[in-house]
């Protein structure tokens, strides 16, 4: 139905006859001659319909609507110099139509304009409800093409490195230590349930036990969790696992993979090796394990300076075992008013969202003198002022914001304020790609609600041998404070991927499961197949998974992963196009041995 794609025509096709098929992007009537922008996936080309050269074609062109599916036969010619369009890849040529055939025409009004010439901002709800139309738009075509290019680049790289692609089950069993599972009732095994995988974690480890050595998969994963702009109930991971490599070898391989993707997809040459930072350093300097290193305003600890101050907010926090930290905002003296920092202000609100009661502050005036208000002013001696200036390195014109309280809350609040002010004050450089490996995570964190330890990543991460030692009798004592051989790749403050070396010893895996509160019987019920496999000669192995949706979002310069997925869900986990999820008939539920207890809420 076509000899060429619309976007492929160039000057070397001049004087040739072509057959094109696509959509009418725009139609313009210029005093008897009609111009049509014909669009397909490859791009757009101008069609010229002259009644003197094709009366039948002109009669068809007079009645065309935008988004009509049209076939065009015609001759390629050079555009006149004055009408060439350098913004269009096909802008040097046009097709003089000899025959037009309508393949299909819209029979109803379109909910929004699709044309690449129309900059209309369409509500996301409308775009998702009519996603098949939205996919015709240049933005979505470009994003999905970029996604394809990213996946193909990764596949070629991994295959060159000796990896093989293996699919793992989508119907599996529910396991603890993760988000909520999506459950699928079994018709054959009444009263029993499958779970959709949150990741291929256990299966890829079993592939290593099976001797495959290097595995990868573009894996579909499912998590029933509260959604944000960068989360979906179903998402895609570039997942891999490898045997007989240590942590540095895994990091080296994966940063070469990332370097290849950024070079071929974005034309950006990354400087390798990528920087490393320990989890402890990241928390101290940035208050988060996903630090954005494109700008300054790092957190600075000042607990030792303010511990003996009369200002109770500071001294009380230190006495209670907490911390006092601060960030220095360059130029903040003039740009951030007191009103914004006090209750009701936007900066105060950001700190409050992170659990902080508020922020203290001092200003460094243009002459270098320190100015502040309230109780902190009455208790800030000249000696303390000098110590704070030296510790923070604050220049004249700066604003110093303080957080005080338990360390976790202080870190979270100052991290949030730091990110907020960096955007507000336009401190984030454009087109910066700041990659960072964060390493040496703790193996466990304390869950105060359940009064137990839980795995920070997952309970299959290997411990740092320096912390664990060689004596199994000491594992139970040393594991709670051990570092994991885990690593996350962070880009511009977002987690791009994460992984670890895995436990390949059954006794140690059992001990870790006990550490997170699983009794022996429960561990066997949940993970017996893995523990059995580890007893049969499991090799040292490790892996990583990259969030493909988020990676493409960053490569495409989008704000939401929904703009990098063909058919995404909303933040309420609904598909507006198909109205999924939907109900099930009584017969279907009966076959599945399931009864619904859902009661529609009463309308007020």
Curated annotation (Swiss-Prot):
Its EC number is 6.1.1.23. Signal peptide: none annotated. Residues 201-204 are annotated as: Aspartate. The gene is aspS. ATP binds at residues 223-225, 232, 495, 547-550. This is Aspartate--tRNA(Asp/Asn) ligase. The lineage of its organism: Bacteria, Bacillati, Cyanobacteriota, Cyanophyceae, Synechococcales. It is found in: Cytoplasm. Homodimer. One of its GO terms (cellular component) is cytoplasm. It catalyses: tRNA(Asx) + L-aspartate + ATP = L-aspartyl-tRNA(Asx) + AMP + diphosphate. Its main location: cytoplasm. The record marks 30 as: Important for tRNA non-discrimination. The keyword Transport does not apply. GO terms for molecular function: aspartate-tRNA ligase activity; aspartate-tRNA(Asn) ligase activity; ATP binding; nucleic acid binding. L-aspartate binds at residues 177, 223, 457, 502. Aspartyl-tRNA synthetase with relaxed tRNA specificity since it is able to aspartylate not only its cognate tRNA(Asp) but also tRNA(Asn). Reaction proceeds in two steps: L-aspartate is first activated by ATP to form Asp-AMP and then transferred to the acceptor end of tRNA(Asp/Asn). Keywords: Aminoacyl-tRNA synthetase, ATP-binding, Cytoplasm, Ligase, Nucleotide-binding, Protein biosynthesis. It holds the Pfam family tRNA-synt_2. Belongs to the class-II aminoacyl-tRNA synthetase family. Type 1 subfamily. One of its GO terms (biological process) is aspartyl-tRNA aminoacylation. PANTHER family: ASPARTATE--TRNA LIGASE, MITOCHONDRIAL, ASPARTYL/LYSYL-TRNA SYNTHETASE. It is an enzyme of class 6 (ligase).
């Amino acid at each position: 139905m076509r000899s060429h794609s619309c976007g492929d025509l160039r000057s070397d096709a001049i004087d040739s006859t072509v057959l094109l098929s696509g959509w009418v992007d725009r139609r313009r009537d210029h005093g008897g001659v009609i111009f049509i922008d014909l669009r397909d996936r490859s791009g757009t080309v101008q069609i010229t319909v002259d009644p003197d050269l094709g009366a039948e074609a002109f009669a068809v062109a007079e009645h065309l609507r935008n988004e009509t599916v049209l076939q065009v036969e015609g001759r390629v010619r050079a555009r006149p110099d004055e009408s060439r369009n350098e913004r269009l890849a096909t802008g040097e040529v046009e097709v003089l139509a000899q025959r037009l055939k309508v393949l299909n025409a819209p029979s109803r009004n379109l909910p929004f304009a699709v044309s690449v010439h129309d900059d209309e901002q369409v509500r996301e709800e409308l775009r998702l409800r009519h996603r098949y139309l939205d996919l015709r738009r240049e933005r979505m075509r470009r994003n999905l093409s970029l996604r394809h290019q990213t996946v193909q680049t990764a596949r070629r790289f991994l295959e060159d490195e000796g990896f093989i692609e293996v699919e793992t089950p989508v119907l599996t069993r529910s396991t603890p230590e993760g988000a909520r599972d999506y459950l699928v009732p079994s018709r054959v095994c009444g009263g029993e349930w499958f779970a959709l995988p949150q990741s291929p974690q256990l299966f890829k480890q079993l592939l290593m036990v099976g001797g495959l050595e290097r595995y990868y998969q573009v894996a579909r994963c499912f998590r029933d969790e509260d959604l944000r702009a960068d989360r979906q109930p179903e998402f895609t991971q570039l997942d891999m696992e490898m045997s007989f490599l240590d942590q540095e070898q895994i990091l080296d391989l994966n940063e070469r993979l990332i370097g290849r993707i950024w070079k071929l997809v974005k034309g950006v040459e990354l400087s390798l090796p990528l920087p490393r930072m320990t989890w402890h350093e990241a928390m101290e300097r940035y208050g988060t394990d996903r630090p954005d290193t494109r700008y300054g305003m790092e957190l600075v600890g000042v607990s030792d300076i303010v511990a003996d101050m009369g200002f109770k907010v500071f001294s009380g926090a230190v006495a209670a075992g907490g911390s006092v930290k601060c960030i220095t905002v360059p130029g903040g003296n003039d740009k951030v008013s007191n009103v914004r920092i006090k209750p009701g202000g936007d900066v105060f609100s950001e700190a409050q969202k992170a659990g902080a009661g508020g922020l203290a502050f001092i200003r460094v005036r243009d002459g270098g003198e320190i100015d502040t208000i309230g109780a902190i002013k009455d208790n800030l001696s000249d000696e303390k002022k000098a110590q704070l200036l030296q510790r923070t390195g604050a220049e004249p014109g700066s604003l110093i914001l303080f957080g005080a309280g338990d360390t976790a809350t202080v870190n979270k609040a100052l991290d949030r304020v730091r990110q907020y002010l960096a955007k507000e004050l336009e401190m984030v450089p454009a087109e910066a790609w700041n990659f960072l490996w964060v390493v040496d995570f703790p193996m466990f964190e304390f869950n105060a609600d359940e009064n137990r330890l839980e795995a920070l990543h997952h309970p299959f991460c290997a411990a740092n041998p320096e912390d664990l030692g060689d004596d199994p009798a000491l594992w139970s004592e040393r594991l709670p404070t051990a570092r994991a051989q885990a690593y996350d790749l962070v880009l511009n403050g977002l987690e791009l991927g994460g992984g670890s070396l895995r436990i390949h010893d059954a006794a140690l895996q059992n001990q870790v499961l006990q550490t997170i509160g699983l009794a022996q019987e429960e561990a066997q019920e949940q993970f017996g197949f893995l523990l059995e496999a580890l007893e049969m000669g499991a090799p040292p192995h490790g892996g990583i998974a990259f969030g493909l949706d988020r990676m493409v979002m960053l490569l495409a310069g989008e704000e939401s992963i929904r703009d990098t997925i063909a058919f995404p869900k909303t933040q309420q986990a609904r598909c507006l196009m198909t109205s999924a999820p939907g109900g099930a008939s009584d017969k279907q539920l009966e076959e599945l041995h399931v009864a619904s207890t859902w009661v529609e809420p009463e309308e007020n």
